[in-house]
Amino acid sequence: MRDIRQVLERWGAWAANNHEDVTWSPIAAGFKGLIPEKVKSRPQCCDDDAMIICGCMARLNRNNSDLHDLLVDYYVLGETFMALARKHGCSDTCIGKRLHKAEGIVEGMLMMLGVRLEMDRYVERELPGGRTSVFYQRKNSLRS
């Protein structure tokens, strides 16, 4: 079973360092390359995994833009629970619950797609008893 928080952390690091993002560029035309690129200290996912997660995020944005924005603020921009609570006018506990809901929705979308991400071997969460999920074991046995 994959740990959705680790998946989103890797996606957030990828999105924060992505040069082809869909937001407005903070660098004026003609000045690209004068400012060093962001530090890549956080582990990132590969482009293929990121595109799959971006598809899930696009669907979440279409259906619930508040939860989408919350995930982007937390995982891409790195805002804290307290900063998000001030921004949304609620408690940090409420932010935690909303984040958990948004993470669950993205995890459900990934399960419905039935895709195997390249980062799965790094983000596997052990089940009680030290086992990995049956889904993961079955996928690995098919590859052998």
From Swiss-Prot:
Pfam families: Phage_antitermQ (PF06530). The keyword Iron does not apply. It comes from the Viruses. GO terms for biological process: transcription antitermination. GO terms for molecular function: DNA binding. Signal peptide: none annotated. InterPro entries: Phage_933W_GpQ (IPR010534). Keywords: DNA-binding, Transcription, Transcription antitermination, Transcription regulation. The keyword DNA-binding applies. Belongs to the phage antitermination Q type 1 family. Positively regulates expression of some phage genes. Bacterial host RNA polymerase modified by antitermination proteins transcribes through termination sites that otherwise prevent expression of the regulated genes. This is Antitermination protein Q. It comes from Enterobacteria phage H19B.
